[in-house]
Amino acid sequence: PRKGETNSAQYFFISEEDFLHKKNSNFFLEYAEVHGNWYGTSVDFVQSKLNDGINLILEIDVQGFRQINDLSFSCESIFILPPSIYSLEDRIKSRGDEDIEAIDLRLKNAKEELTFANEYEHLIINDSFDVAAQELYKIIAKEKPLNKENNEELQQFLAQLLSY
């Protein structure tokens, strides 16, 4: 866990051995190894919440999204874009919990993930937290149908990000 994270709050922390056993037992709806750590979403947890009529927001990486997408799972997909690669680097550095090699790996992986952004139904630029939160709310509340393919400004922004 990172500083400030507690078990059962941000994540459920388990040993790598336990995780791999659960992965091999089809315990996870999606899973991925990201920056040397394993992450996954429990099928039972998701199913129980959906059975209770609760909509979920899964904060997952591209690997997990693609696994869920391959299952034809009914969902809205939203890719959160950084305002620039430089600001993303600043945000990672400001956490103060990564060495330079880890920061470089995160940036390399982020650039790779950006190439998959157009597989998502919605794109949000996280330049201002308040504005990004409002955009997210509009999508969730179905107030903003966003056809990203016809949004030339958004496509130009994504092309600019990918050019770094």
Task: Identify what each model region corresponds to.
Residues 97, 115-164:
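NTP-dependent small-molecule kinase module
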Residues 75, 87, 95-115, 130-131:
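Ras-like small GTPase catalytic G-domain
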Residues 2-4, 66-68, 85-91, 131-135:
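Switch/connector loops and helix/strand junctions flanking conserved nucleotide-binding motifs
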Residues 2-7, 68-72, 115-118:
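Short loop/helix-cap segments at secondary-structure boundaries that form the rim of catalytic
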